[in-house]
Amino acid sequence: MPKDPIRVLVTGAAGQLAYSLIPIIAKGHVFGDDQPVILHLLELPRMMSVLNGVVMELVDGAYPLLQEVIATDEEKTAFTGIDVAFLVGSMPRKPGMDRRDLLTANAKIYQSNGHALDQYAKKSVKIALKLKVSSSDVRNVIIWGNHSSTQLPDVSHAFVNVGGRNVRVADAINDDGYIQGEFLSIVQKRGGAVIAARKLSSAMSAAKAAADHMHDWWHGTPEGHWVSMAVLSDGSYGSPADVMFSYPVYIDSQRQWRIVDGLSMSDFVRQKIQATGKELVEERNEALAFCKE
């Protein structure tokens, strides 16, 4: 029996990240190859002509699962009745800009999105080489904390398939200096490196990450596997409370997440978690101040 379509919103739909994300959704790679979708695409009035071009490409693509496309510059139309939202519309980061420079503009954007989400959307809506192996061979790497240069990539509990055997990543690399130094720096500074090379912020990889993230939320995580997800902090692992903090989480078949508990932690990791948590508290307070102005 055919499934009823779900309504999926993408904000900033004429932007470069959305341009990479929208076809991934339309192809069924996020919600399943038997799940019809109705796309709601939201843009600013001045970008509607560009968005109309995106709609034309979607029509020309003849995606079997795409039942309808609603392109609009009105939040009420965009948010009404949606099941899932990808809130990717924001001021882009440019060369020389720090993430903190974007707080003022983007706090206002997401404040408006939040009001519309609460008022119009369904209440069930979901917001969304070292070892010379494939990334699919690696599992349970953790990203702790903020999406910034203080984020902490942690391989303490990660495993990699090497020659058919599951091996701890830390044992396979066998180089704490690399793990706590070069590897850490590469991940933390990746966004800036992409901007320096492309003169634009990440789009293709960011869209893939958003799609993978929503896929895991929609379908759940396999037994024994976790993913990193920014959720409202409960103070676990010494993180500050009441900020959106990235933790390792399990997701069940009912799309409910829970923070993985009981993980052992080195002093190095604990100190980095405290540092990224401190930054998040500062950014939260700044963003809230902007919203009150």
Go through the PLM ranges and name each one.
Residues V10-A14, I22:
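N-terminal Rossmann NAD(P)H-binding glycine-rich loop of SDR-like oxidoreductase domains
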Residues G89-M91:
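Conserved NAD(P)H cofactor-binding loop of Rossmann-fold oxidoreductase domains
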Residues Y19:
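Residues forming the Rossmann-fold NAD(P)(H) cofactor-binding site
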Residues K126-E293:
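C-terminal substrate-binding/catalytic lobe of Rossmann-fold NAD(P)-dependent dehydrogenases
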Residues M1-P5, K292-E293:
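Eukaryotic N-terminal low-complexity, Ser/Thr- and Lys/Arg-rich leader segments
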Residues A85-L87:
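Redox-cofactor binding/interface segments in oxidoreductases and associated redox assembly factors
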Residues K27-I82, M97, N285-L288:
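Conserved N-terminal Rossmann-fold NAD(P) cofactor-binding segment
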Residues R99-K130:
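Rossmann-like NAD(P)(H) cofactor-binding subdomain of soluble oxidoreductases
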